[in-house]
Structure formats: structure tokens, C-alpha cells
Amino acid sequence: MSGEGRPQASVPQAGELRLGIAAIRWHAKITDRLLERALAAASEAGVAEPTVVRVPGSIELPVVCQQLAHQHDAVVALGVVIRGGTPHFEYVCDSVTAGLTRVSLDESTPVGNGVLTCDTEEQALARAGFEDSAEDKGFEATAAALETALVLRELRGFENGRGFL
């Protein structure tokens, strides 16, 4: 895990934005904590009532995030994929990452990728935002999605002659 070069996580004031969060049910201890931290970031940003949807697993995240993107300014995907003894890990990770990127581009809506792809459960715990975790990916993914939504809002205003303030 390399934290070198990582900027300090800051949460923008984004109370006017609509946020959708999709979280998987697998690895509940970790995923529930990712969700708690995502909701903490949303609250800190002033987002009153994010839409939260639970899905069976990581493969289902892209299609649910695509639907959320139709009605929200920013979306966050939360989950955990832990390497096993078969190539399934690579298939799932590649599919989820490509799917979430495609949703973001196709819908012009930022999708914060808070899906942990780890070799071990210990690595996932270290990234999930617990008291003794080195990283806080649910919080970070939410802050990034909200900040990007605000940048897009300003850029779209620029197209209408407003520009950045």
C-alpha cells in the first residue's frame, strides 16, 4: 500500500448535489464500514439524504450505478473483492472497473470507485476506514465523486458562458 503522493482528502460543500451510493452485500463487516464512511463524507459535504442501494455483489455494481446516474449528480460504488485461488478475481475486478468507468463516461456523471481489490482480508480492513486503518476508501471515493460533480457543473456552466467562479 503506497500513500506516497496521495493528496489530503477534503470534502467540498455540495449540499445541492444528489448522491447515489451502491454497496455490495459480500464481506459485510468491511462493506458496511465503507458505507458508513461514505455517508460520513456525504454528511460533511452537506448532502442531506443520499440514495443508498444494496446489491448482491460487485458484478452488479455497474448496472445499478448506471441507473443511479440517471437521477443523481454523483454516484459511489462500494465493495470488496478478495483474491481466491482461481482467475475469477481478475475477471470480476476487470469487469467492475471497466463497467464503472463506462457508466461514468456514458452518463457524464462521476462514479467514485470505492471497490477494494485486495489479496487478503487484512489488506481490505486496512483500507476500509476503521480506527486503525491506514486508508479510508469509502470516504475518499465519496469526496472525489462530489468534487468531480462540482467541477462538471462549473464546466457545463462555462459552455453556457458562465465559466468558473
Swiss-Prot record:
Pfam families: DMRL_synthase
Annotated positions binding 5-amino-6-(D-ribitylamino)uracil: W26, S58, I59, E60, V80, V81, I82, N113
Top-tier EC class: transferase
Presence of keyword Transferase: yes
Annotated pathway: Cofactor biosynthesis; riboflavin biosynthesis; riboflavin from 2-hydroxy-3-oxobutyl phosphate and 5-amino-6-(D-ribitylamino)uracil: step 1/2
Highest taxon, organism lineage: Bacteria
Record-listed (2S)-2-hydroxy-3-oxobutyl phosphate binding positions: G85, T86, R127
Active site residues of this protein: H88 (proton donor)
InterPro entries: LS, LS/RS, LS/RS_sf
Signal peptide positions on this chain: none
Keyword terms of this UniProt record: Riboflavin biosynthesis, Transferase
CC terms in the record's Gene Ontology section: cytosol; riboflavin synthase complex
Catalytic activity, reaction form: (2S)-2-hydroxy-3-oxobutyl phosphate + 5-amino-6-(D-ribitylamino)uracil = 6,7-dimethyl-8-(1-D-ribityl)lumazine + phosphate + 2 H2O + H(+)
Gene Ontology molecular functions: 6,7-dimethyl-8-ribityllumazine synthase activity
A biological-process GO annotation: riboflavin biosynthetic process
CDD domains found in the cross-reference section: Lumazine_synthase-I
Family of the protein in this entry: Belongs to the DMRL synthase family.
Role of this protein: Catalyzes the formation of 6,7-dimethyl-8-ribityllumazine by condensation of 5-amino-6-(D-ribitylamino)uracil with 3,4-dihydroxy-2-butanone 4-phosphate. This is the penultimate step in the biosynthesis of riboflavin.
Family annotation (NCBIfam families): lumazine-synth
HAMAP family: Lumazine_synth (MF_00178)
Protein name as catalogued: 6,7-dimethyl-8-ribityllumazine synthase
Species, as recorded: Saccharopolyspora erythraea (strain ATCC 11635 / DSM 40517 / JCM 4748 / NBRC 13426 / NCIMB 8594 / NRRL 2338)
Gene, per the UniProt record: ribH
